[in-house]
Amino acid sequence: MGFAEKFIASLSSRNLRNDAFHHDLDVIAAAALAGDMGALLCRVKYADGTISRLFEGNAGNLAQLLRAWTAAVAKKGQARRWVKATTAWDAQAANTLYRRVAEASLAHWLDSKCKVCHGTGVVSASEAGAPLVCQACHGAGEAAISCSGGFELERIKDMVSELEAIFQSHGARAMRRLGR
């Protein structure tokens, strides 16, 4: 069982005791102690109920994550020289690009499931009755990233992989804290 599965299982625990026999909250404690951005990603994606749920989660965590991620994307964009900002207009365009990339990459990472097949990769055929490969995602179960152009799309894909790397390293640090 991976870190995400253990974290989700800990969230639904009915036993809040923490003694020699009950260890349900250890994963949540390890997640909190393992880091800042990864812990926030974990909280927003799995604990706040913002993904495909009918209730509102903690919008403050999502807003905090969006601010932190936008600042991180701007820093990465400047370091990687995505846009040469020589004039005030260039700086404004660069900031707009950083914000759009941050918002789109975070939205895709938080909920990348195909809306047509709900992430399964197959849809039921009404006439034949047999399942068919989803045409929207071509059976992958992951929705395509929608944006205006190729330049922006490549930056969004790059930042989605950065988010996944942050989350994976956070999970590894948390599992080390658990001693497993």
Q: What positions do the PLM features span?
A:
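Long, charge-rich boundary regions
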Residues: 142-180
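Short, flexible, mixed-charge glycine/proline-rich loop motifs
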Residues: 100-113, 121-129
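Cys/His-coordinated zinc-binding microdomains
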Residues: 118-121, 138-141
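N-terminal alpha-helical interaction blocks
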Residues: 1-100
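The −1 position to Zn-ligating cysteines in a subset of zinc-ribbon hairpins
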Residues: 113-116, 133-136
